[in-house]
Amino acid sequence: MMSLQQNALQFNSKFSFDFSGGNLSSDSGLLFIKEFIYKIGFDNLLNQYFGADNRKIHSVSSVIEQLIYQNIAGYHRDDAADHLRYDPVFTAVLEKEALASQPTISRTLNSFEQKDIDKFNDILEHLYKMTHNPLDKRHIILDLDSTNV
């Protein structure tokens, strides 16, 4: 059994982690999120559905991925992108020298059409099918709440 003290991340073997101290970052938990996203192939799904664009620096899929990480880390406003643009954890996780700026994010979001919303729905459906097995009926979970009647 592996312990957390001796591990490397699969999405980028240059990263390893231990809990013996050193430089701290309040956003370093994103490395574990990146590992999860890598293992389920979510980044490949984004590229499959949104990867065919001609933007040179920040593709639609990379802007979406950046927004996902920003929200997971608690940066819910798109103007946080300007403060995080060169953050070492974010640039490492997104594998970029610089993140998309707030205006780039706004332009990307404002360019979405119904076909893009349909792509998001397809991604959600794919993730659901990946994680849900209707034939697995060994466990039934009943969520019961008490009520005052």
Description of each model-found segment:
Residues 1-149:
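Dynamic "connector" segments at or just before major functional cores
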